[in-house]
Amino acid sequence: MRVIDRKTGKEVVAGDTLIRKDYKGFRHRYEILEYLGSGMVWVKKLTQGDRWVYLSMPLASLQLDEVLI
């Protein structure tokens, strides 16, 4: 299984950093830590207050797609 970024079309692997905007337009940095399977990913999110938050998120919320090879 490969995970592809919808915005750039490039493959995303554990350790990569993504920058995404939330619904209010604020930018957040997400570092991919691990793929949990079944469309979920474990991430480290840098918030506006310069704090790191660890989350499990669906791939779709980070604009990522799973591709089977």
Set out the residue ranges of the language-model regions.
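Intrinsically disordered, low-complexity, charged/polar segments
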Residues: 45-69
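Mixed-charge, Lys/Arg-rich low-complexity intrinsically disordered regions
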Residues: 1-14
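Short aromatic-glycine-enriched beta-strand elements
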Residues: 39-42
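Short beta-strand-centered aromatic/proline hotspots
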Residues: 26-35
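Generic beta-strand structural signal
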Residues: 13, 35-37
